[in-house]
């Protein structure tokens, strides 16, 4: 699932991707990287992330993104890499508490 929307720089919104089956996904890195005009996301909080090991650069440089669905409910137990996950994002973005204090920018 990595890099699906990477560099879609004119993408403003997405269709409903909330019901995507992510049960066996292990990599979500660079998923929305460089989607500079993306200003909202569907409710991706329903995604099953229990097998995901890499979320690096997932929302990197999503400069117009002003809010996230409640991804604090995701399962991060197997996550090994999350470097720069929110790098270049608005400092007003509602970052989940799991990432507060981490080097993620």
Question: Where are the model-predicted features located?
Answer:
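Negatively charged
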Residues: 1-105
């Amino acid at each position: 699932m990595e890099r699906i929307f990477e560099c879609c720089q004119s993408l403003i919104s997405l269709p409903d991707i909330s019901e995507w089956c992510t049960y066996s996904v292990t990599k979500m890195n660079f998923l929305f990287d460089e989607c500079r005009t993306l200003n909202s996301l569907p409710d991706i909080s329903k995604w099953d992330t229990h097998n995901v090991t890499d979320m690096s650069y997932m929302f990197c440089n999503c400069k117009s993104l002003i809010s996230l669905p409640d991804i604090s409910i995701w399962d991060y137990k197997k996550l090994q890499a999350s470097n720069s996950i929110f790098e270049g994002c608005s400092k007003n973005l509602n970052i989940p508490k799991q990432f507060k204090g981490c080097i993620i920018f």
